[in-house]
């Protein structure tokens, strides 16, 4: 695989730069606002010393080419990054960057909270595989351990699904909760989480999207209990939206159900609205957290879920987040872009904008987050290339971008400070009604989101872009591509025969989670033994180093 060099902008004259900027940016498109903070050809981990790193590589405990970052979250001076154990050789799945020590560049990932807590297969004490994570306003880090090692047909399940919550002040785990068997099924794959804080930190709920088991799981912090909503067709994929095109690779993820989720600010009734989308879909759905917080509604809530309009073509999304003033950001994986929508506006393509797009740096923007200071963080990882072809490890493959939210949405349809869009309109979930006919419902199910919006909003204005140079040193083409109208063809060139030819159905990172009552393979280079070492084993490598300490070297590294 290679990346085509777009060239610097120094050779462009002022006139040609202006022409490029004007012709390449659509009316809803922002212009190179995300700033690259960190980047890697391949991931590296902060081993205690060089000798242990060499031993880990020699033994297969660390295989750099097998590590792919998928989740990002920011808190204080730490930027958390998750690395699932899809392949052997992943020494830690929950890691962070000390941003005081590494302002930019390609920093080593530090296991969080320490090496021992990242021991695969040590179910009660460690995290085997983490995907997307969430920091709440109470300073807690929520991590769902899927308990899996491997990908597709290679998946094993050393541990059950478990919610892990860490106090980020003390860096200690303060809660571990195993999902009961009733909350999962043989196809369960949970890779996303949303956290809902109510009137105080104890009034907290987490929601988990079961992408391949087609369900939505609620967990109550106060009750330390969970329950599952699984009887809704909105959790399922759209059979017409299972075809994907990313980085020049055509593939089918037609089985991908509910995935991306976001929560609105608390509404006047004291609850939030959860928005969600199946991955194989271009449509968004909504439900009040009043329903999700009520265990008695798991079988009687069909009409409380609401369908919104489609986003438009090439609009698959895996990650979404909403600010406390109602701006939703979401990745657009087919378009190498990050989109936006203001939740006070109708959910229609007219009111969707693109805050940034990059056919090199944003190939598969896997995760999007907004931190407590309203800074946006975006992680891109070229995931389909990693899964279906070969990454070129002489090229930059993984990037983390950041920008203030206000900067990203400025002069887009999501910026309500622009009076041309008219005053905001309140959009709310329909109230629960009692027995009897339900207004607006037909015999076939719930209606589309058809609230009347007043005042009538004018057509989105055209946005003019000046000749100021972009923040990055290349200008990716955003025009029509050879793939047809609206088709995005990335400038990343890949081979397509190392795993399978492009265009065929390929296994994604899903599992068949049947932990209860079954035996699973728990050996291999990806698992560290949990027994204390004998005296003769001291100095025997990373495994021994981890097991010889109650806590890892993280504290020394952090204080250093």
UniProtKB/Swiss-Prot annotation:
Coiled coil: none
Tagged with keyword Signal: yes
Signal peptide segment: 1-30
Glycosylation site positions: 153, 224
Pfam families for the chain: MRJP
Keywords for the protein's UniProt record, in alphabetical order: Developmental protein, Glycoprotein, Secreted, Signal
Comp. bias regions, Low complexity: 471-480
Cell location: Secreted
Entry GO terms, CC: extracellular region
Domain of life: Eukaryota
Chain positions covered by the region annotation Disordered: 452-492
PANTHER family associated with the record: PROTEIN YELLOW (PTHR10009:SF14), PROTEIN YELLOW-RELATED (PTHR10009)
Entry's family note: Belongs to the major royal jelly protein family.
Biological role: Controls the pigmentation pattern of the adult cuticle and larval mouth parts.
The name this protein goes by in its record: Protein yellow
Species in which this protein is naturally found: Drosophila pseudoobscura pseudoobscura (Fruit fly)
This protein's encoding gene: y
